[in-house]
Amino acid sequence: LSVHVAGNWGKAELGGEDKQLSIAYPSLMKEIFIEIKRNNTLENFEVVMECTHHGPLLTKKPSMFVEIGSSEKEWSIPEAGKIIASSVMNALSKKITKTKAVFGIGGLHTTPILTKAVEKSEFALAHVCPKYNLENLDEKMIKQVFERSCEKVEFALLDWKGMGKEKTRIIELLEKLNIEYKRTDKM
């Protein structure tokens, strides 16, 4: 069971456009994630925030994907659908408290380190560029992250151990753009 915003850090292999991000709604994504965790009764389903990936490209209104697994096997489990539906409805029935949005950089597709760092904090993930896409992270894409969130992105949150060989280049890029960054291992 997962929540994420759509977008492509590189080539658009699953819809959308190359190197284009949809508009994120960090506080609502976090609220839905929390509701799914609270409502999840399925033993074989992990609840995760995923990195930004796939299309479509939506740039007029904030959007997100709330997903049940990645195959027909998971999609056909009625209880999973009920958990997702009730979680989304519960979240939408609340007054969403604006959080401080952050740009996640590095780590796995399912963002365990970044999610853990923000889950019980005042912060919420906007876009997340995972380790496998860091080579596509350039000045244009970083600027796009800060432009394509309906809430102000406060800083970049680095999955320090999940940045690999791109770490130095990305830090230099963030410093060049005067973007504050924090390390997950220091939070």
Regions found by a protein language model. Name each.
Residues L1-F45, E175:
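N-terminal catalytic cores of peptidoglycan-degrading enzymes
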Residues N39-T41, P56-K60, K95-T97, S149-C150:
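Solvent-exposed alpha-helices and their adjacent loops that cap or buttress functional pockets
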Residues F45-H53, T99-G106:
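A short glycine-rich, hydrophobically flanked beta-strand micro-motif that places a catalytic Asp/Glu
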Residues V48-K95:
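Active-site-adjacent mobile loop/cap segments within catalytic or ligand-binding domains
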Residues K73, K161-K165:
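Short acidic, S/G/P-rich loop/turn micro-motifs used as interaction or catalytic elements
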Residues T97-K161:
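Acidic, Ser/Thr-rich low-complexity intrinsically disordered segments
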Residues V118, E166-L177:
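Short, aromatic/basic amphipathic alpha-helical patches
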Residues I179-M187:
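A generic structural motif
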